[in-house]
């Protein structure tokens, strides 16, 4: 049975008819300040190491590149991504014959920006809502404790602020806390949450959610799912079943599969990402808890590893601290405020 945590007929903002990115709804200046603050520890750690690596050196040589490789790996950029960046810089050094250490920061900046662009990251991120996709269905995956429910709540807030009618689905039926937390977020944001009894079939919850959303004329549906990795086959089967059942209501659902990762866990986030990519087709990433950590390099490495764009980053506890990921702004905050 479909149960709404709050009144599904609650008033919502008028639905806007144009397809918009959420970056337009926020003050860019405020976003930039939040981003700068969130990446401050990453920047300080990274550039402190970089300054020491080139101390007393006038040109980029093998020793400098070896030091840079170590810096990137210890900054949680990831081994594969680090190798790619070093190879690109080596090619430039070989081509230009002489590259001064004073140029290294700009070269590194350009290569990181290029890598992010190649993985589909752009300057106007976040989810856009095509007019012919209604409701737009987002299935959210990720292990427990990464900020999945919080991300869903903040994402629902942003959609609602943009004038969209949102319905949430509590398909993580294995943890009572997960359903309770989602209902709390639904009440806080002012959007309905569809749930069933604990232990119910998650696919059944997803079916009810989409049916309810269609009946209400909702613009967006966000489905929470269980965050279990101890049984990869079971996870894969469960997510596949949810997708198949949703397609009985919305034939091309889900339109996005958003993987939420905890950026502060560094290398653990890479392993989680690998497991979920094996279990389902991830189309977008949200990297949370970047504020207060020096592990911001994980954003670069995971996007490059998976060849999946980062759509959102979490930079704090406030509703607006879930920011649409903007490649240029991210690189600017990491390296300074010059043009990327």
Specify the residue positions occupied by each region the protein language model found.
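Non-catalytic terminal/linker segments enriched in charged/polar, low-complexity residues
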Residues: 1-139, 157, 161, 165-168, ...
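P-loop/Walker A NTP-binding module and the surrounding RecA-like catalytic core of P-loop NTPases
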Residues: 110-113, 119-340
């Amino acid at each position: 049975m479909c149960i709404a945590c709050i009144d599904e007929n609650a008033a919502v903002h008028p639905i806007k008819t144009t397809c918009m990115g959420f970056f337009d709804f926020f003050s860019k200046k405020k976003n930039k300040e939040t981003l700068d603050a969130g990446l401050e520890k990453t920047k300080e750690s990274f550039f402190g190491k970089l300054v020491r690596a080139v101390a007393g050196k006038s040109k980029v040589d093998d020793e400098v590149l070896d030091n840079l490789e170590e810096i990137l790996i210890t900054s949680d950029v990831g081994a594969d991504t680090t190798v790619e960046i070093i190879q690109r810089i080596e090619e430039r050094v070989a081509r230009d014959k002489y590259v001064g250490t004073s140029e290294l920061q700009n070269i590194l900046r350009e290569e990181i920006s290029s890598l992010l662009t190649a993985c589909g990251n752009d300057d106007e991120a976040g989810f856009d809502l095509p007019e012919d996709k209604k409701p737009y269905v987002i299935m959210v995956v990720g292990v427990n404790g990464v900020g999945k429910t919080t991300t869903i709540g903040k994402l629902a807030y942003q959609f609602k602020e943009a004038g969209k009618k949102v319905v949430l689905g509590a398909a993580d039926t294995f943890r009572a806390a997960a359903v309770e937390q989602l209902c709390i977020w639904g009440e806080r944001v002012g959007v309905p949450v569809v749930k069933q009894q604990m232990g119910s079939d998650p696919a059944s919850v997803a079916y009810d959610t989409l049916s309810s959303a269609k009946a209400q004329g909702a613009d967006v549906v966000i489905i929470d799912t269980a965050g279990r990795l101890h049984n990869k086959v079971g996870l894969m089967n469960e997510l596949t079943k949810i997708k198949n059942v949703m397609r009985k209501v919305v034939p091309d659902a889900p339109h996005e599969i958003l993987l939420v990762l905890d950026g502060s866990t560094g290398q653990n986030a890479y392993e989680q990402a690998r497991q979920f990519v094996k279990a389902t087709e991830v189309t977008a990433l949200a990297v949370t808890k970047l504020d207060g950590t020096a592990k911001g390099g994980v954003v670069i490495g995971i996007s490059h590893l998976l060849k999946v764009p980062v759509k959102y980053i979490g930079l704090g506890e406030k509703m607006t601290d879930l920011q649409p990921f903007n490649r240029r702004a991210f690189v600017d905050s990491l390296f300074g405020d010059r043009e990327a």
